[in-house]
Amino acid sequence: MSKQFVRSAKNLVKGYSSTQVLVRNATSNDNHQVSKDSLIELAEKSYDSADFFEIMDMLDKRLNDKGKYWRHIAKALTVIDYLIRFGSENCVLWCRENLYIIKTLKEFRHEDDEGIDQGQIVRVKAKELTALLSDDERLNEERNMNIKGRNRKGRRRRGTGRSDENDDDLQRAISASRLTAEEDERRRKQDEDYETALQLSKEEEELKRLQDLQRMQQQQGQQQLQQPMYYDIFGNPITPEEYAQFQLQQQQQQQQQQLQQQPMYYDVFGNPITPEELAQFQQQQQLQEQQYLASMQQQQQAMSNNPFAKSEQSSSSPKRNQLVAASSPQQLQQQKQQEPLIQNRTGNQSMTDKYSKLNELLATGTGIDTFGNVGEARIPAQHTKTGTFINSQGTGYRQVSDDPNHNPFLNSQYTGLPSTSVVPTQTGYGFGNQSQQQSQNNGSNNRGYTLIDL
């Protein structure tokens, strides 16, 4: 009673007409079904243009109501279904023009507090109305049949009063509509289940393909981060194996160029040696030369006062292996053949320069020396400058006689040398390293030698 009172008060406050109030009561938000009297009255009022617009305006508001007022929507669809069957032709035209509103209700859903989907009845009624409005032949046939039945019922109503409450035709039509709606709903569920399963299968397949693609992209990205990209001279990407092969070829070419530019070294036997061995040998050779030069300086200092000592600079020098840098053993042999022979000097250069004139006279002249020798038998004068005879081999060295009585020829010999007696200097290993006692013995033994003894 409270809801009816509130609805009545709202009708008065908003100034609804009797036709609008009739539509509001027929589509109220309660559990009661729409009364048949209200449907018949609304169908009759639909033939009036003013009432028609009021009826359709209120039904349009009910169809666009909120989801929690699902009873308003369901009852409004029931009223529209009755009007297109038993109402005026304008009701059919209005429904066809606003068919999109009815089609949207085919997807209507609403769950109550208990989790029950109350939008099922709305979806069934909307689908049935859409099918009926789309089939003109069926709609015209039902309208003609219902109009004839309504006329018969009108005549019976005038004769029998209110005997049309249990109209069998209306009950059969409602039952047929319900069966059709249930069958369509069952078929739609099956189609929806199949479509849902197919859609899920497609989505799973697409998701799997996307995951595989992402995994491949991640692996490629990791490989690119771990391995740098290499390019050839034309900017084309190459694999690391090709780049390593290219680097190896470059290294081999560089090594070949270095070998071609670097000279080959050979020993005296023509065997190739490495630059390290050459450097080591040169270092050893330099050390040997330094040692040899040091020893030669000592010998020259000791031999500076001995005009008869032979210079052993070239004769006593050690033979050293020579290394030749050449590109081939043939060039080494040619260099050996082209090397000129080095003339080794013997004797003291200063003495040779000093007595060069005398040597020339003695070698080319035809005179006789102090001993009467002629030709090659002549003895150079420098061997007798001390006043005591010394032959060309140095025998009789240190023959200095205090008593010249044994040889009367020595005191009278004069070969152009100064008369000042020359004291011999002990040089060389053979003379300078002898002990003093041995030297005195040699002097006493050699004293008194004559030309005949020598």
UniProtKB/Swiss-Prot annotation:
Query: Where's the Glycyl lysine isopeptide (Lys-Gly) (interchain with G-Cter in ubiquitin) crosslink?
Result: K357
* List of residues that carry Phosphothreonine: T160, T180, T364, T366, T384, T386, T388, T395, T415
Q: Which residues form the ENTH domain?
A: 11-143
PROSITE patterns found in the cross-reference section: ENTH, UIM
What is the topology of this protein in the membrane according to its UniProt annotation? Peripheral membrane protein
Give the highest taxon in the source lineage. Answer: Eukaryota
> Which positions bear Phosphoserine?
S163, S328
What biological process terms from GO does the record include? actin cortical patch assembly; actin filament organization; endocytosis
**Listed result of changing T395 to A/E:** No phosphorylation
The entry's localization annotation reads:
Cytoplasm; Membrane
Does the keyword Nucleotide-binding belong to this entry? no
Regions of biased composition (Basic and acidic residues) lie at 180-191
Query: What PANTHER family does this protein map onto?
Result: EPSIN-1-RELATED, EPSIN/ENT-RELATED
**Which family does the entry's similarity section mention?**
Belongs to the epsin family.
Q: What does this protein do?
A: Binds to membranes enriched in phosphatidylinositol 3,5-bisphosphate (PtdIns(3,5)P2) and phosphatidylinositol 4,5-bisphosphate (PtdIns(4,5)P2). Required for endocytosis and localization of actin. Negatively regulated via phosphorylation.
Q: What is this protein called?
A: Epsin-1
Q: Which organism is it from?
A: Saccharomyces cerevisiae (strain ATCC 204508 / S288c) (Baker's yeast)
